[in-house]
From Swiss-Prot:
Substrate binds at N232, R481. SUPFAM superfamilies: PLP-dependent transferases (SSF53383). It is found in: Cytoplasm. This is Aromatic amino acid aminotransferase 2. GO terms for cellular component: cytoplasm; nucleus. Induction: By aromatic amino acids in the growth medium. Expression also induced in ARO8 mutants grown on minimal ammonia medium.
Length: 513
């Protein structure tokens, strides 16, 4: 596929353009089906499918008590609940008799339709035709399952994959399991929101001069994997102008972009040191429309005129990780190949999880349903409002943690710098060596620092452990990653921040270069 070609709006052109990206294993995947999936009339007795009758299920009904507000143990939120009831016959579109049964590999239609509408409203692919028939979504069993299926479909021993130099390392493990080679892409580690994230100049030079560069013995990259918003571990986001440049590079050098976005809805307005606990999410002026248009970073899908972006989303961060429920967005051709893999491996994700998520979203809609909104619109609006409340809580936790870190003696002595995050769950703290030379044995010194932190009663992640190539990132890996997600309450986050400051101070009090 070449830059400037007409957008591929039909399956035939998608197949022509993206067949070369497929793993050699893809051609051997086919489900050897022995059943006839055609519809039968109601008067036919079904003896073909190996499905237990729903009366064999030990659960006949479930009642869900659904929070309207996260952390609603506050007395003022005493009545902030709604409910959902599920039984063998209801809700009519997704009763237990259906959701607990074997189901379509791509996902149960009610939730699948909601998810596609959700993506279309927020990040509609630029290559989409009017009927949205050339792209689709499939549900999957959590982010790692999505990654596994994507990389198994587009990677093999001949593939080179680019990944941000610090990343969620299981993604790298998934790539390497296919035999593909991983190379690190330099990042700008800064709290400047207009320059942070992938170093576009470095990426341009690397690709434009591939034949003479450091990886000239490898095949030219066919894939970029990126956590572009609220990046793990850095909490940084690739600004819009960089996204446009990266997409142009993808066109020029013909590679796919796998955009992993578990944190994208957890946007953080900039920290205000004059009003450290200021939270724009509490503003009465913040509508769902403004949140979507002014707060959220737009997906690479919205730039994707060529259909070369595969987007991964999950319910783990905005609902619950134990559901193991995620979804993949891509052009119809690539998505069918991913679905072919699911057909012979995991099959459908948990129907119980799908039923719980769908019923919860529907209940949120019903509790706020008005005559001006259809159920479809109310479900979208209700779910976005829930996400905004989650984002608001995370933003408060971010502000509280930053304030507590800035008040520590260690920070005020210049022993560390806080890289304020722009989205997500993570904050990184860069260690400042001050009058000391940066140690040659950096990983060992970071391990020693970790022991001082544990001695003070706090556990974090060491930056070098999340490096794609520790040697390549040696000069940038002297940071700590802390998460603001799991702490019980404000007091625990404040205490953890104090302990971090104390641990870093003790480390430097005992440090010998």
């Amino acid at each position: 596929m070449t830059a400037g070609s007409a957008p591929p709006v039909d399956y035939t052109s998608l197949k022509k353009n993206f067949q070369p990206f497929l793993s050699r294993r893809v051609e051997n995947r086919s489900l050897k089906s022995f059943w006839d999936a055609s519809d039968i009339s109601d008067d036919v007795i079904e003896l073909a499918g190996g499905m237990p009758n729903e009366r064999f299920f030990p659960i006949e009904s479930m009642d869900l008590k659904i929070s309207k507000v996260p952390f609603n143990d506050n007395p003022k939120w005493h009545n902030s609940f709604t409910t959902a009831h599920l039984d063998l016959g209801s809700p009519s579109e997704l009763p237990i008799a259906r959701s607990f049964q074997y189901a379509e590999t791509k996902g149960l239609p009610p939730l699948l339709h909601f998810v596609k509408d959700f993506v279309s409203r927020i990040n509609r692919p630029a290559f989409s035709d009017e009927t949205e028939s050339n792209w689709d979504v499939i549900l999957s069993g959590g982010s790692n399952d999505s990654m596994f299926k994507v990389f198994e479909t587009i990677c093999d021993e001949s593939t080179t994959v680019m990944i941000e130099e610090f990343t969620f390392t299981p993604a790298m493990s998934n790539v390497e399991a296919t035999g593909a080679k991983v190379i690190p892409i330099k990042m700008n580690l800064t709290f400047d929101r207009e320059s942070q994230g992938i170093d576009v100049e470095y990426l341009t030079q690397l690709l434009d001069n591939w034949s003479t560069g450091p990886y000239k013995d490898l095949n030219k990259p066919r894939v970029l994997y990126t956590i572009a918003t609220g990046q793990n571990p850095t909490g940084m986001s690739v600004p819009q102008w960089k996204r446009e440049k990266i997409y142009q590079l993808a066109q020029r050098h013909d590679f796919l972009i796998v955009e992993d976005d578990p944190y994208g809805y957890l946007y953080f307005p900039s920290y205000n040191p004059q009003e450290p606990l200021e939270n724009p999410y509490h503003s009465s002026d913040l509508t769902t429309e403004r949140y979507l248009n002014d707060f959220l970073m737009k997906s690479f899908l919205t730039l994707d005129t060529d259909a070369r972006v595969i987007r991964l989303e999950t319910f783990s961060k905005i609902f619950a990780p134990g559901l193991r429920l995620s979804f993949i967005v891509a052009n119809k051709f690539l998505l069918q190949k991913i679905l072919d893999l699911a057909d012979i491996t995991t099959r459908a994700p948990s129907g119980t999880s799908q039923a719980i998520v769908y019923s919860t979203i529907k209940a949120m809609a019903e509790s706020n349903l008005s005559s001006s909104l259809s159920m479809k619109e109310a479900m979208f609006e209700g779910w976005i409002r829930w996400i905004m409340q989650i984002a608001s809580k995370y933003n408060h936790r971010k502000n509280l943690t930053l304030k507590a870190l800035y008040e520590t003696e260690s920070y005020q002595a210049g022993q560390f710098t806080v890289m304020e995050p722009s989205a997500g769950m993570f904050i990184i703290i860069k260690i400042n060596w001050g009058n000391f030379d940066r140690p040659d044995d950096l990983p060992q010194q970071m391990d020693i620092l970790d022991k001082f932190l544990l001695k003070n009663g706090v556990k974090v992640v060491l930056g070098y452990k999340m490096a794609v190539c520790p040697n390549y990132s040696k000069q940038n890996s002297d940071f700590l990653r802390l998460t603001i997600a799991y702490a019980r309450d404000d007091d625990q986050l404040i205490e953890a921040s104090k302990r971090i400051g104390s641990g870093i101070k003790e480390f430097f009090d005992n440090y010998k270069s």
